[in-house]
Amino acid sequence: YHGNTLGALAIGGNAWRREPFLPLPLTATGNNVMAPSDMAAGFQTIANQGLHHEPYFVEFVAKPDGTRIYTHEVTGTQVLDPGVANATIATLKGVIRSGTGSRNLRNFPRTAAGKTGTQDNNTNAWMVGFTPELTTAVWVGNPDKYLPMENIPEFVAAGVDKVIGGTFPAAIWKATMDAALFGRP
């Protein structure tokens, strides 16, 4: 897994034609080309009290009789102080309860934390969040151009004149999390 290359390819373009990643202070709110997998990997580190696990694609491989011939194992790396991660979690809970994500997430039935983000001119919109069980990142935008998501007929018909992180990305995040965690305590 190579975050920047995968990120460029994962959103539908050629890694060599994309703008380079710029380490700007507003990266987490959508001003750089980042893959949802990169955003989810960063947020899972916060959710895990600073313990980072590299993303992977295969959990296990089993024979037809159920015998496992491969199981992914990882110990993780502590990259943040747990106190710092916990303070961040406390702040990110507010985004869902009363902040920018609350329009669609105020009544989310689980303990959750997250961050919305919208790039200048509404060209990219994000919702990245987690529960104790799962971290999910949602990105809405055009993978090849910076096109403003304003007055788009399909969005307007759904009651949204201007797409921001707290609108469609938050609603998609909620629907995904509801389905993924259905039936789990």
Regions found by a protein language model. Give the residues of each.
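Mid-domain, small-residue-enriched loop/turn segments at the edges of structured enzyme/sensor domains
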Residues: 1-40
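A penicillin-recognizing enzyme superfamily signal
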Residues: 33-185
